[in-house]
């Protein structure tokens, strides 16, 4: 699909950057020679816009071998960021898709500044080509034919091998994020814990990873009472899924990802209202993020050791379902008083984290659509984070900045720990109250990480979006897939 060339040949469409400073630049003047000065006229008439994210389509009318030029407005160079570039290219690729373009090119060097080099631009362009043109996988009888971009050429004076490598990495990041999106968008009668486990096994086998899928009997033997409690009301069997990637000869410095895999959450006996229940098929967004990251890791083969653990079940109501006031025993041996059956994700993660440690994880990152409280605190564009280790958090933060998936650290104070330990009957309670809800959930999970360096990522606000945006349609976003993978790729770098 991807090619690198030094000069333009014949293409259906070409993407070109247009900064505020480019109105009279030598670059525009050179391109304008073929248009006999018409580009300058369009700029002066403001029909060719340099405004951020503005997409201006110009037909060559046979003046060049390119049928259409798509000029991408990027504003002033001083305010140019990777986020600006991602959003603008997202709109550009949507425009190409709407025009059913199959052969396109990008004048890569037109996007290069002292802030972003050609490798950065190539990575982002290939990544966004997948993200921006993703479409919801529907179950409608009448399916529309989709025209795919079949050829994409980067025009640049830079080293072709380096640019090809950046295009490949970006493409893998985008494709894996879309894989996660598709998982989250699947209906719960299709994506059960069993089906999620089957997907994970196929992924592991494709990339020659080791894997384990624990069945209910094995979980009982290991004392995974927290996950099993959540599963009590269901006719669907639970699964504890583990993928093991060995990127080093020696099994050390193991990064452990733990993704919440609740395939549907009714709230249990602490039942959600109707309007709060619709959409709970997405409560396995953390599992999808982890699996998406493992897809990238499998493709790119970084020299790191990684474990991905997914505790999976649905949370439903029946005569056998767990109840408020129950006391359960987790795999760690810690007992938990259940005050809210709708705070089930942290119970599943408790056993998931303990199991990841058992498998040898030296560093932990859990990802979960955990609390409505984090949405109240941070909105729908920022993921909440908590940690017991600032050094590990800084690495996660740097990865999130590189991928433009912003995170914000929430605190853990001793008084928060005291609140989750406030129980007359057990070591912990799973829901101390609504105040500081996101912090309480993260603090609870931290009790199972114990001394192992750990970062908690609450993606309840960022996992899905209610409307179309520059990088995709409404629905799942694939939040944290690229951040987790980038963390592994950069782990330990100074």
Swiss-Prot record:
One of its GO terms (molecular function) is manganese ion binding. GO terms for cellular component: cytoplasm. Its cofactor is Mn(2+). The active site is at residues 272, 346. It catalyses: Release of an N-terminal amino acid, Xaa-|-Yaa-, in which Xaa is preferably Leu, but may be other amino acids including Pro although not Arg or Lys, and Yaa may be Pro. Amino acid amides and methyl esters are also readily hydrolyzed, but rates on arylamides are exceedingly low; Release of an N-terminal amino acid, preferentially leucine, but not glutamic or aspartic acids. Mn(2+) 2 binds at residues 260, 265, 283, 344. This is Probable cytosol aminopeptidase. It comes from Bacillus mycoides (strain KBAB4).
